[in-house]
Every structure is written in C-alpha cells, then in structure tokens.
Amino acid sequence: MSLDSRRYHITTYGCQMNKADSERMAGVLENMGYQWSENPDDANLILCNTCTIRDNAEHKVYSYLGRQAKRKHAQPDLTLVVAGCVAQQEGDALLRRVPELDLVMGPQHANRLQDLLEQVASGQQVLATEPIHIVEDITKPRRDSAVTAWVNVIYGCNERCTYCVVPNVRGVEQSRTPEAIRAEMVQLGEQGFKEVTLLGQNIDAYGRDLPGTTSEGRHQHTLTDLLYFVHDVPGIERIRFATSHPRYFTERLIQACYELPKVCEHFHIPFQSGDNDVLKAMSRGYTHEKYRRIIDNIRAIMPDASISADAIVGFPGETEEQFMNTMQLVEDIEFDLLNTAAYSPRPGTPAALWDNQLSEEVKADRLQRLNRLVGVCAELRSQRYANRIEEVLVEDQNPKDPTQVMGRTRGNRLTFFPGNIEQLRGEIIAVKVTEVRSFSLTGEPLSSVATAVR
C-alpha cells in the first residue's frame, strides 16, 4: 500500500479521556503517513475507541464492529483496530467474537500504536492488554479543535466504587510530572490554542503517586499546586479540569479556583446518589452532607459558578425513599447540567453479583422521573443568564445557522451569536444574552475581551 493511499478513520465512544486518547492515536497515525478520512468507507484503517462504562455503550461498539467485519471480507487489506475499555476488558474474548480484528489494545497502550501496527503489518493478530507504565508521548496529537484542547494529567484510578469498571480497564493512577504538563500547555499556547481542560479519571488524585511531601505533611504535587504552576502559560486564556471526586475535593482547591483568573468557574463533581446508605454501598467515601458542603463552599465565593454532576438511579437495593433523597438533592442544588443513568451491571464489579438487583421497569421509571426534575431545575437555573453579559470563547460556526458562531461561557454554557467564524475563531467576545434555554444561550456581540478576567 502506497503512503498516499493510507487513510484512517477513528470512531470514539465514551468519556473525555477516550476523546483525548483518540487525538493522540490520530497523531501517531498521521506521523506514520496516514491521512484522515471523514467517511469510514473510504478508509483502509478503522480504529474504534471503545467505552464499557454502561451496557448500551458496549452494544453500540459491537454493532459498529459487526458492520466493519463484513466490510473486511470484501476488502481484505482493511486494518481493523479496537482500542479503549472494551478492548481491555474483553481481550481474547473480543478476538474470538470478531476474528476479523487485527489489533485489540487497551487504553494504556495508546502511545504504542505505531509499534503494534508494525506487528500487524508482519502478519500477526495482536493483543495488547497487559498493564504497563504509561510513558510520555512526544507525538503531536491531531486535535479536534483549533481553540480548545484536552491535556491528560493523570491516567487510571485507584478508587474501588462497587459499580465501576474503570479501575479494571484503565489501571492504577499514574500522574504526569508538572513539567511535562506545562511543556505541553506551552506548546498549545504557541500553536494558538486558547483553552485547556486538564483531564483525569479522578483528577483530584493528581500527584499522589509522585514523590515528595511538604513541610505541612501533604503531597508536594496536588491539583491545586498544578493549577498555580501552569496558570501563567502564555497564550492560554482559560483552564478547566475534570473529573472531580467529592472525597478529595478540598477548600484549598476552591480557593485556588477563585484566586486564579484563568481557571473557569465550572466544576464537574459527580455525586451519584443523594442517600448515604446507597453511597456507602457504592463505596464512594463521602456523605450527601459533605457533597452539599462542597457546593455551598464553592457558591459562597463564586455565586455564579456552574456545577455539573453525574447521578445513578436504580442501584442494587435502592428503595423508593432512597431514590427520593437523590431527587431532593437535585432539587436543592439546581445543577447546571446533570448526566443521569440507570444502573448497569458491569462484569468484574462487586455490585453486579449482588442479589438485590432492581427490575428494568423500576430503573426506567426512576430515570424518567429524575430526568423530568433535571429539566425543570435546568430551566430555573438558566434564568440567571437573562440579559447578562457573558464572555464567550468562539470555537466554531453554528452548524445549523452559518450566520452564527458558537462558543462557551466561562461556566461552559454553549452560546450562539451572529458573527463570521473566520474573523472570530479563538476570540473571547462579550455577548449580551437575549435568549435563554435550558442548556444553551443566544445573544448579541458587544465587544472583544482582551484577556480572560473575572
């Protein structure tokens, strides 16, 4: 196959970590001479980056792989790669189920893609799921945006939530050094990127595995310290971080977010349940009272902070009263965004083996009731934006209206307004909000904002 004819397509399922991994693997492929194909049918290398967090995500993966496997029978030179969490969890079983696959690789092996594909080229069917130490990757990722970028700061997770498969498939926590993270951000600033989201499955655990302690006896490297360390990177106007764990969310972190003007007032802190007994069964390590205190402390010094979260309903043994405690917490806090899901038993997790599973009907009913409440609360919470002036970082053209551009406020609210994307991409614009919806805004531009200021 000539270099000119090598084309690839990546389909990504799941979380922000997967999206960041896909960008890195795309960078590896382009470094090898592959060119991106928007249409998977025109590609001769298909990479499916998978998610196993819930059962329905896994079904989507197998449906997609089934279509590509049929295609390989008609196109033998097609290279089929499965990466990510399904690959890590299923391993050999995935190769048996879809024998047309050339490479199955877990998320810890994303940086090894070139070496693994060279093994495939020698005629091998390759399985790479063994735990390894993740080395720094100097390959330039192929970023999906020209304005915003993901930067991994910690891989893996050491928590053992009884419903969650992530520690099994992403391995133990491995923090990058502050110097490596800053170097990547400096490069992004030089390339014209304006916003960085620092990523970790449990980002508040950043630095626990790095050496060193302070005179106060705490870890020398924490997320709070990292924010101070990277805050002055030239060119980067905004910094976000995700995903937080209430168990490790500190007052010191809240104060840093308040003091550092580039850090956006946007916090994604999953609570999962509003009932203490359910939280204990989940092994989450905090109470709903602690969670409420975290939100109260954030809003005490940042009243307009945007709070998003995740919640699970129908956990094994959850009673109607316990579910109503979740409903009460949602009503009390009024989240800006709440990702909801019915509990889905995952292989290899303790909760999947318990005999107090709830029926699908009960789970579906509770999810529907919660979603109705979420919609009402989001609409009420959104009203605070009416007639306000918001700083919007312009990212792209509105795909539904070419006369408009779209971007996000500091609170991560999607916002549309009239403008020319070629002139405004990457600019921070002051926008007067004229229309409020539950999860987005429309407005009129007022002026450019030179720097991100509170």
Curated annotation (Swiss-Prot):
GO molecular function ontology, one term from the record: 4 iron, 4 sulfur cluster binding
Catalytic activity: N(6)-dimethylallyladenosine(37) in tRNA + (sulfur carrier)-SH + AH2 + 2 S-adenosyl-L-methionine = 2-methylsulfanyl-N(6)-dimethylallyladenosine(37) in tRNA + (sulfur carrier)-H + 5'-deoxyadenosine + L-methionine + A + S-adenosyl-L-homocysteine + 2 H(+)
Organism: Acaryochloris marina (strain MBIC 11017)
Tagged with keyword Iron: yes
SMART domains per UniProt: Elp3
GO biological process per UniProt: tRNA methylthiolation
Keyword entries, A-Z: 4Fe-4S, Cytoplasm, Iron, Iron-sulfur, Metal-binding, S-adenosyl-L-methionine, Transferase, tRNA processing
Subcellular localization(s) per the UniProt record: Cytoplasm
Protein name as it appears in the record: tRNA-2-methylthio-N(6)-dimethylallyladenosine synthase
CDD domains according to UniProt: Radical_SAM (cd01335)
EC number(s) on file: 2.8.4.3
Main location: cytoplasm
Domain Radical SAM core span(s) in chain numbering: 143-384
Domain MTTase N-terminal: 6-122
Residue span, TRAM domain: 383-447
Purpose of the protein: Catalyzes the methylthiolation of N6-(dimethylallyl)adenosine (i(6)A), leading to the formation of 2-methylthio-N6-(dimethylallyl)adenosine (ms(2)i(6)A) at position 37 in tRNAs that read codons beginning with uridine.
Presence of the UniProt keyword RNA-binding in the record: no
